[in-house]
Amino acid sequence: MKAFISPTHDVPWPGNAMIRGLLKQHHDRAERSIEILAALKDDLRLDCQFVQRAAERPIELFEVHAPDYLHYLETAWDEWSKAPDASFEVRPYITTNRYFPTLRTQIPVTLAGRYLGDGGSPLVQDAWVNMNGSVDAAVAAADAIIAGERSAYALLRPAGHHAMRDLAMGGCHIANTAIAAQRLAKRFGRVAVLDIDVHHGNGTQQIFYDRDDVLTVSLHGKPETLFPFICGYADEIGSGAGEGYNCNLPMEGGTAISGYLGHFDRALERIKDFAPGVLVVAAGFDTFRHDPFGNLDIDTADYAVLGLSLIHISEPTRQEAIS
């Protein structure tokens, strides 16, 4: 298997995140990505390829995200930093809401409240470059599948499954998984996205919610107890043409592998019924029992069991894992 490594996977970004009212060091640290890369090369002996920054942005970036949102991400730091008392992180402290749904004043403070959906998604200098490094790796992995590879892995940082069409959330600004799925759909027609992160993949869900060519399946802890809190419920099944093509499988806190496998098997059966041409896996591992931001009870050895199941289901299709 080829592994495509984002050129920005080890940059020291982001800094801090507001989590349950406390400012903490962001969990998506460079050290984590460096350790994953070492395991890919030394333990799994994958063919690791560092992706070079593409000369042009892929068209799927603009198909998945709103133009005004992308413009904001590209220019936010420069505009924010012009203020003499600007912080080193762009962070919202006033937001649009039901009383003020539109922005009459287009200034850095109000724009941050419009496009950054929580306190855990700050922007820093070079953020735009870093995000696009992840996009390039996701697209490279998708292109490898299109070229005939049976499977491919993309090591991405920053992550993307919380990023919505025009809103950053959960430390995610650009929806890497959705961009890969969008690119693959043009070649294979039907794409399934399986998200195994402990947190609901709200961004991927929102982007494909009204489509029937992309099935989105998310296994996660109950939204009453875990981010993003406001979505990820089982009755969110899609709308319009996409009704029935979104599947959420929330689990109680403390769920161990025995209980997890029941939900996992349901997810695989739904994917089999959909009969996709390609499977994209958003592979978060914060279901691990000692993860400080999760609440499930999955152990290290359990991931091998899940991986083997994914290999078996991907036999009639192709498989791409997005981490």
Locate predicted features.
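HDAC/HDAC-like amidohydrolase catalytic core signature
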Residues: 1-194, 199-314, 318, 323
